[in-house]
């Protein structure tokens, strides 16, 4: 995305207090700061546009606000991060100035700012509705693991795939690379509006993968190929790993 478009980019970070494996994780301490603040810092370092955190708990609201970041309260009833960021979008940009919405998950405290920027690149092609990220799988166990979502895609360049399907199964069959989907999205505003209006689709329910809703509706998702998968913090062990990574960076 060129610099001329940066005024039209809004980065939204959904944060939810309820977590089965790591309750209250947005406020988990990482190097003296709540995890959600660390994520907001990485998003700000990407320097692609306005950053807003969408929360569902006053404690998270206060922590983000105290750190100097823009924050908006959203419903605790949302079933997905996409629904949460859409509510936030309506509240923080009712005039519709933002043309591109980047959804950065609130549990990625170690994400490289360049990785955030990369999600926007597929939208340079006006035929693309949603940009996302992927990386080649180099671990044999990951190729068959259902928690590793695979992108079945057709190459459109050396660094980009057109997403044809997303699955927890091992796919595609045969020789060649397999790609791990990274759940960071950049939407055209109209695409996000359409996406949330559709409701869950048949394949989305079957695979438990929200992005299939877009594909079933005929929307185009392209995935930029990046070098590494950012650490998602879902367990106490993940949290300790994130602390080690950021401690080493600030060293």
From Swiss-Prot:
GO terms for molecular function: 3-deoxy-manno-octulosonate cytidylyltransferase activity. Signal peptide: none annotated. GO terms for biological process: CMP-keto-3-deoxy-D-manno-octulosonic acid biosynthetic process; lipopolysaccharide biosynthetic process. It holds the Pfam family CTP_transf_3. Keywords: Cytoplasm, Lipopolysaccharide biosynthesis, Nucleotidyltransferase, Transferase. Its EC number is 2.7.7.38. It catalyses: 3-deoxy-alpha-D-manno-oct-2-ulosonate + CTP = CMP-3-deoxy-beta-D-manno-octulosonate + diphosphate. It is found in: Cytoplasm. It comes from the Bacteria. Pathway: Nucleotide-sugar biosynthesis; CMP-3-deoxy-D-manno-octulosonate biosynthesis; CMP-3-deoxy-D-manno-octulosonate from 3-deoxy-D-manno-octulosonate and CTP: step 1/1; Bacterial outer membrane biogenesis; lipopolysaccharide biosynthesis. Its main location: cytoplasm. Activates KDO (a required 8-carbon sugar) for incorporation into bacterial lipopolysaccharide in Gram-negative bacteria. This is 3-deoxy-manno-octulosonate cytidylyltransferase. The lineage of its organism: Bacteria, Pseudomonadati, Pseudomonadota, Alphaproteobacteria, Hyphomicrobiales. The gene is kdsB.
């Amino acid at each position: 995305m060129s610099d001329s478009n940066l005024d039209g980019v809004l980065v939204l970070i959904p944060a939810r207090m309820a977590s089965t494996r790591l309750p209250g994780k947005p406020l988990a301490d990482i190097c003296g700061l709540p995890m959600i603040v660390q994520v907001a810092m990485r998003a700000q370092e990407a320097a692609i546009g306005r950053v807003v955190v969408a929360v569902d708990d006053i404690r998270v609201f206060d922590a983000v606000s105290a750190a100097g970041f823009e924050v908006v309260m959203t419903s605790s009833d949302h079933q997905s991060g996409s629904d949460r960021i859409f509510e936030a979008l309506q509240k923080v940009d009712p005039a519709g100035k933002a043309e591109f919405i980047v959804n950065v998950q609130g549990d990625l405290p170690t994400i490289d700012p360049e990785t955030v920027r990369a999600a926007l690149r597929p939208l340079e092609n006006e035929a693309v509705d949603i940009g996302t990220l992927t990386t080649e799988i180099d671990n044999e166990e990951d190729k068959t693991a259902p928690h590793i979502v695979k992108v079945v895609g057709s190459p459109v360049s050396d660094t980009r795939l057109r997403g044809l399907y997303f699955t927890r199964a091992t796919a595609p069959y045969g020789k060649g690379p397999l790609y791990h989907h990274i759940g960071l999205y950049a939407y055209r505003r109209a695409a996000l509006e359409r996406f949330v209006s559709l409701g869950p689709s048949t394949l989305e329910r079957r695979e438990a993968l929200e992005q299939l809703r877009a594909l079933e509706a005929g929307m185009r998702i392209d995935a930029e190929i990046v070098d590494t998968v950012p650490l998602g913090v879902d367990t106490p062990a993940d949290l300790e790993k994130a602390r080690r990574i950021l401690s080493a960076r600030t060293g």
